[in-house]
Amino acid sequence: MDESKAVDNTVTQQAKLTACLIVKDEERFLPACLASLSGIADEIVIIDTGSSDATKEIASSKGTILYAYAWEDDFAKARNFAIEKATGTHILMIDADERLGKESKDKIDRFLREYPLSLGQVAIKSPYQQSDGLTYTASSKVTRIFPNLSTIRYQGRIHEQIISTDPSIQTVATGIILEHDGYALSDQAMRDKTKRNLKLLEAELEREPHNAYLHFQVGKTLVADRQQEEALEHYELALVSAQEQATYRPELLMATLYLLKDMKFQDKIWAWVRWGLERYNDYPDLYFFVAKALMEFQVDNLPMIQQCLELCISLGDRSEQYPCVDGTGTFLAQFNLGVFYEVQNQWEEAQNHYQSSLDQGFTPAKAALDRLQSKVLLMKKR
């Protein structure tokens, strides 16, 4: 697309949004993704890298513009190919296992209207289960919506990042939400994805052995492959070498801490917690982790558990500032304070916190309230 024409379109004409997808064997997820784009994207460009299932048929039946593409083990190349095929003034890059959140249309319209020459960050919401049986949702910020200019392209074979060569282009938060289902893959599909990613990342790391971000991503992939000791080496190397202002470093810290907790390396946990608090003393996820780790390791320090959870609540939602697990500064902290007071038989305090958690939409708090009520009734009968 001619850049001068794109700038003119972006600024003076009605915005046109092209959604771009890179797909292979996505018949399971693609229908929901395309449905979420209906009435929002003016054009949908799908780059198929060799599907053998019904992906291409689904794409064609939904009126998308479909291109075959020979996969070159390079996600940035594939995404840039999609951008070249887009005719819109703006690009929304979305994966097949993602869906636009229901409230995103107005936010997209506002971004296109008020920030036509900016890079737009969206929140990717990824649900996952923890060992306590509860479902948590990780929230991370990624640039996915941007003007269709030749100065804006992707770099990196894997975990590619959008780069603008124009220093005047700013990045803004949009409030747009993408709901991610990628962790719902079958075991075999997840193993295949992990193997592919690890191969690409290791090739990149050979070229850039001191790239802290690559070490972080290798560590994440090794965790998924259950290679914990090797993952920890990459995490710790990334932590000490990442630049102070690196936006991914808080997420890297939390990934390291949760891995150490799984490995039950308590001494290392508290050393990295101290390191983290020196840098991120307003990060609710960090205090939430400390409280959960103290409880899990049965450390006899009830005042510290209480203080950490209360600090989470006083800090509140910091998802605009940090990559967060939803609720660490709100409903999850309230719920865990409920647990804290319940095990000490302080039932009125427990009830108040469970109720507050439920009022904020955390449905497991309802079962906790019912359980607590049964306990109270049983004690009264005695």
Identify the meaning behind each predicted range:
Residues 42, 56-81, 85:
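Conserved donor nucleotide-binding strand/loop of the catalytic core
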Residues 28-31, 53-62, 103:
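Acidic helix N-cap motif at the loop->helix transition within catalytic regions
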Residues 16-18:
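Cell-envelope/extracellular polymer assembly enzymes that use nucleotide-activated donors
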Residues 2-5, 77-83, 89, 94, ...:
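Catalytic-site signature of metal-activated, phosphate-bearing donor transferases
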Residues 20-43:
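Short, well-formed alpha-helical segments that are part of the catalytic scaffolds
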Residues 36, 48-58, 71, 95:
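A conserved acidic beta->alpha catalytic loop
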